Amino acid sequence: MDFGMFFSVCFPLLLISVFSLLLSTAVNIGFGRAIPLTVLSVIVFLYPFYAADSLRTGRILLAIVLCVLCIALTVCCILKSELSDRLKKHVASTSFLIYCALVCLLLLLSANKFVCLWDSLRLWGAYPKALWTYETRQLGADAIVYPIMQSYVPGMPLLCYFMESFSRSFHEGFLYFTYGYFDVILILPVIEIVTEKTRKAAEKGYLFFAKALFFSIVGAIVIPWLIYKNYGPYVTLYIDPPLGILAGYYFAVCFEGFDSGKVPFVSALLSGICLVLLKDSGMLFAVAGVLGAAICSDKVSLKKTMLGSAGVLTAVLVVWYSWRHLLNVYSVSNHLSHEITHPGWSEILRFVVNVFQLDAVELDLVAARICISFPVVLLILLGLKLMLAYFSSYRFKRELLESTVMLMTAIAFLVGYYFVFQSSINEENDFPSYSRYLGSVILCLMYVLEYDLAVRHSGLIGRHKKGLRGWIQTSHKKKRFIKATKYGLVALTVLLSVGSLLYIFRGKEKITAPDFVQASDIADSLLHSVETGDKLTDVYLCIPGDCKRNERLHHRTYFELIDEHIRIKNFYLTTDITSSGSGYSSGQFIDILIADHCDYVMFSGISEDIYHEFSDILGDVSVGESNVIYRVNAKSRSIDRFNKQ
């Protein structure tokens, strides 16, 4: 990658970082609080332009606005010595230095990654690539994104698109960077709170940096790893980890209250909108957060909290309704394959009890694996939250209300999950993608707990009668205890850092080498054979053998051809057209090709079943041939062997 290409890829990142630094200086907030506002604003800003099918205009306008604001804020910092001094402090702050280090680390680790998993290839990786290539709304028959995937909200794909929009070529690894970057910037507020508290406590040296590093490593890497393992952030493109972290950030801001200034309200507003734009289930978190803020507010701040909650809820509902309206306009149905019905409260209760018996967290130790069920995780997290409030002399009743809100949100998520997937659960007695979906709730709770710990950890060592220091002072081994705690914190930080780096280096989306090579071979054959132009060229891909085994081969081929104006028209379930698969006859197959307006049909291989069942339309072909391409002739209702000269 030459310097020009590297700069084009990193230009949006540099723009976001510089603007956040200047914004934190102008508004007098920490960099860790400013960077989430900037990144979330990118998604919120681009969404109306995407809905209006003017994504390119929105991207250019956003870049211009950020550049103009950066120039204006820079001039202000030069003219005002107070702002200049504040900027220098922010540049030298621990949160900014940790941010720079984590960004460099993510750039290094994501450089050579490829999109490989199922949902990543057909949705979370394909969506941003389609936006980068065509810069058009991916809804309706003209979209390259499959119809079954079009109902997914475009929040994260829009962010991925902006991060790569100034590059001359699409980089798969930068998708992983964007996902990891999104998680990191949401952890920065926690890191900054810790650094502020420790500075006020006059802590210096290795302990100060150990605390900041400890919170960054635990929050950004260790917690998601415990929940998601091989399906977590930095190694996959699943949206559930970012959704859980954003939900935790949103709840933390809402519980903080809207009476302490405009920043908490703006943070809640942007994060609430982005929750709805990240995934459908984000609507539950968005509504629960503002309701929790209203329930937990005291009499003094009740009016401001109610007004702030009403504003956030209104914005969330407007965005949600606008997306539903778009889906209706383009006749895009929900990706669910069944109607949602009420099964009865007894069935729901039975389901919840069964779910409570499943494992939510797995800890792989040297000689054993410890599995912790979902209710145990909930009780541990909520118990720690209440215990933290007790020892830090915080308002215990308010903390009890917050814990109740979080518990009710988790239960509502479970019940909603049952309504959505009741068909597959009843038929197969299984819980599809349970660990990923439910992991969002656990990750949200863990974030709130870590945020509380960061806010109140100085209270744990403060001069409170119920504080830990009061207990420590009664001990004759006070000095030894404090010294052991310091060294233990440093040692734990080192171990977590090493383990986390090993996790990121070793954790990768995996695809078998034959599938990867064959997908590239199929894509190259199509590129060198079919005629392409500004209009999409539709190809029906036939793969001999079980369609489920060939799922990733189909998806990878589809993904590689997105930016080449070639669309694999059929979904993976119809790649096997023989009697062992879809069971088409020759006439039915021709009818399907014509009805789907396919320009070409490609056989990745000619098996004996394909040869015998479709010999009347294949013409001069032999068993064992690979990458055989035919042009679809709608007038003569036939397919003709095609070789581009």
Model-derived regions, located:
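Membrane-embedded, hydrophobic transmembrane alpha-helices
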Residues: M1-K88
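Hydrophobic, aromatic-rich transmembrane alpha-helices
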Residues: S17-T25, D183-A201, A294, R369-L400, ...
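Membrane-interface alpha helices of multi-pass inner-membrane proteins
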Residues: L46-Y50, P264-D280, A286-L291
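Hydrophobic alpha-helical membrane-interfacial segments at the cytosolic entry of transmembrane helices
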Residues: V91-L106, L270-S271, C296-R324, E402-M406
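Active-site lumenal/periplasmic loops and adjacent helix-entry segments of GT-C-fold
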Residues: V103-A212
